[in-house]
A protein has these predicted regions:
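Non-catalytic C-terminal accessory region of glycerolipid acyltransferases
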Residues: 2-11, 15, 110-277
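Generic preference for hydrophobic
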Residues: 36, 51, 78-79, 186-188
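A generic local structural motif
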Residues: 21-22, 35-39, 64-66, 113-115, ...
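Helix-to-loop junction immediately C-terminal to a conserved catalytic motif
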Residues: 24-55
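Alpha-helical membrane-targeting segments
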Residues: 6-33, 87-99, 171-181
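Short gly/ser/thr-rich secondary-structure transition/capping motifs
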Residues: 30-37, 107-110, 168-170
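Short, flexible loop segments at the rims of nucleotide/cofactor-binding pockets, characterized by
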Residues: 26-32, 103-107, 137
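Catalytic core of membrane glycerolipid acyltransferases/transacylases, capturing the structured
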Residues: 44-107
Length: 277
């Protein structure tokens, strides 16, 4: 049995269906007013594929794994920070059970092959947040090219997703959504593939634009700021001068973990050396 066999195990999938769809989803949906759009764009989609989304709340991963049709994403595995979610047994069990989570190293450690690449090669779809950490303001940082590199290297599609209103409902620093069931809208985009000769950086930028294009019309309808109209994400107590020019968000390592971070994925898969994460 391989180290990744549990991610596609029917037994684990059955347990996850109960905990995720029959327990987690009702609790989450009762805390916010959730609407899901664009699932018809996933018709005919088959693993493996990568899901990418903007990231400003711990609601993001929950919304995506609970909203994606089970037939399409029942085995969807969520990347999670190894230095937070996999250091204590209760977090490891929790994230594995609810999110089919796999570890992403944010320390710069490289193994011969990333878990993400291995999962995709075994037809397990994955969820990544290419910004690498949650935004403090809802602004979107530059997408790191790791998810795009995985797509190019393995010749698989990427599904862009916009999570709209999650920052307003449960911003970074809150452990539960605000009272009153604030609205959150999740929009699935059509699967995308790299153009012939397109680099991971260029494809990643195109994926980020696709997320913006999904996000902004919905934000207008909800009466909240568009994704690029928000102030840059700055950790409380830090000056904006510490930001990388043009980054649009804080690129420092998250201090309390994020499910779905792809901060380290863009290493060797992006450079085609085959020695990733």
């Amino acid at each position: 049995m391989s180290r990744t066999s549990r991610y596609s195990s029917p037994l684990h999938a059955a347990a996850r269906y109960v905990t995720q769809r029959l327990l987690l989803k009702p609790v989450a949906w009762s805390s916010v007013t959730m609407s899901v759009e664009g699932t018809e764009r996933l018709k005919g989609l088959k693993p493996p594929y990568v899901v990418v989304a903007n990231h400003s709340s711990h609601l993001d991963a929950t919304a995506i794994v609970c909203a994606i049709p089970w037939k399409v994403g029942g085995n969807l595995a969520t990347g999670a920070a190894a230095d937070y979610f996999f250091t204590k047994w209760h977090r490891k069990v929790f994230t594995a059970l609810l999110f089919n989570a796999f570890p992403i190293e944010r320390s710069g450690v490289r193994n011969k092959k990333s878990v993400a690449a291995t999962l995709l090669s075994e037809n397990v779809p994955i969820l990544l947040f290419p910004e690498g950490t949650r935004s403090y303001t809802g602004a979107m940082a530059t997408f790191k090219p790791g998810a795009a590199a995985l797509s190019i290297n393995q010749g698989i599609p990427v599904v862009p997703v916009a999570v709209v209103g999650a920052h307003e409902a449960m911003p970074r620093g809150r452990s539960w959504p605000k009272p009153g069931r604030p609205p959150v809208r999740l929009v699935f985009g059509a699967p995308m593939e790299a153009e012939p000769g397109e680099t991971p950086v260029a494809f990643s930028a195109r994926l980020a634009q696709a997320v913006r294009d999904l996000f902004d019309p919905v934000a207008d309808e909800m009466g909240i700021l568009r994704i690029d109209d928000r102030p840059p994400s700055v950790k409380p107590g830090r000056s904006r001068d510490t930001l990388t020019p043009g980054s649009g968000a804080d690129s420092s390592t998250d201090d309390n973990g994020d499910a779905g971070d792809s901060q380290s994925i863009e290493n060797d898969d992006a450079t085609h050396s085959g020695d990733d994460q």
